[in-house]
Amino acid sequence: MSNKPSHPKNFVYPENTAGSKAAMSHAPRVKPVKKPAKRKILKAKKNNYLKFTDVPRSFREKIGYELADYSVALGYAEDAKATKFEIFGSGVLVRKGNRFGVLTAHHCVHKLRLGSFDSDTLFLVLKRCHRVVLPPIILVKHALAIPKANKEPDLAFIEILPSPQLGSIRAIASFWPLDETHFNISKGFVGIEKPFTVIGFPGAYHQTNIEGNTTHKIIKHTAFFYAIGQDSIRERDGWDYIEANNRYGGKNELPKSFEGVSGGPVWGLQISRDETNGELSLKTFSLIGIAFLQIRISKQELRVRAHFIKSIYDLAWRSLG
C-alpha cells in the first residue's frame, strides 16, 4: 500500500449533517459557507456566547465540516487488502502523551485481534473519503474500560505505532490532544444550556451498492446538536457521563437507531457573534466525551449516553501509567 492514501473508488464520504433535540437536517456536499444564512436578529448573550438554538442550520453544518478533521469510521476487513469489509463503528483521533491512535467504545473493537501478522485488518475512513488500511502489526489495543453487566464503563484506545501509515494519517487529519486537565476543560464547556454535538456514522444511513466486482459503501458523517440540561451529567463509580436526549415526532429526520455512532466523539462548543456585523464564529471547541450507549425511553424518546470529561482525560488512562 502506498504511504499516501488516495481517494478510493468504493467509498463516498458522507455529507455533513446537523441535528438538534428534535430534528436533524441533511446538508449537500459543499464546502463550508463563508456567510451565515439569513436569519432573525440575534440578541446578545452573556459573555457574547450563543445557545445552539440561536445558530442557523448552515452554520451548524459548517461546524460539522470542521470537526470532521478528527472523526473516523472504523472498518473491519477479512483480508489484508480489505477487499471485503464492513463499517462497524465510529471513533476520534487522539494523542495522549507520545501515543497516537483512535479513542472509541470498547464494545466496538473487543473482538478485533491485533498485534500480529495473522490478526485482523483494521481500516479507517477519514475526512474527504481517505481510507487508510492499518496492518495489525502496527496496532495495539488498550482496553481502557471493559463494560460490566450495566454496559458501563466502555472505552478502548487503538494505538497506532510509528509507521508510514501513522505519518499518512497525520498529514491528512488531526489528532486531538488529551493532555489538558479535565478541570480546565470543564471550566469552558460545562454549564446549563452550553451547546455540544455528538458525531458519528449512523448505520441507518449506510448503503451498499455492488456493481460487478466493485462494492460501493456510502456512509454519512453526521452531527447531532444539543444543549446541556439539568439532568444531562451524572457520575457512577467514579466515571462521569453525559446524556443527549432525542425526541421523535413531527417533521424531524432523526435516525430510528443510533447504532454506528458508538465510539464517536462528543464536542463542547463555544459560539460567538460579532457585535458589529452579527457574523457567527466557532470561538473554540473541545473534545468532551465518547458516545457508547443508546437507551430507548419510549417511542418518542431515545437517549445517547457518552463518557464525559473526567473519564476520557484522566480516569481511563490510569491503567496505562
Model-derived segments and their meaning:
Residues 159-165, 187-191, 244-257:
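A structural micro-motif recognizing beta-strand termini
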Residues 251-285:
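Catalytic nucleophile loop of clan PA
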Residues 2-90, 95-96:
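Protease-domain processing segments flanking chymotrypsin-fold serine proteases, especially trypsin-like
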Residues 204-254, 259:
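A mid-sequence, solvent-exposed acidic-amphipathic segment
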Residues 251, 281-321:
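C-terminal cap/linker of serine protease catalytic domains
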Residues 53-56, 62-164, 223, 265, ...:
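Catalytic histidine site
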Residues 152-180, 192-200:
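Internal, conserved structured core segments that host functional sites
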Residues 176-223:
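Short glycine/Trp-rich loop-beta-loop segment that forms part of the substrate-binding cleft
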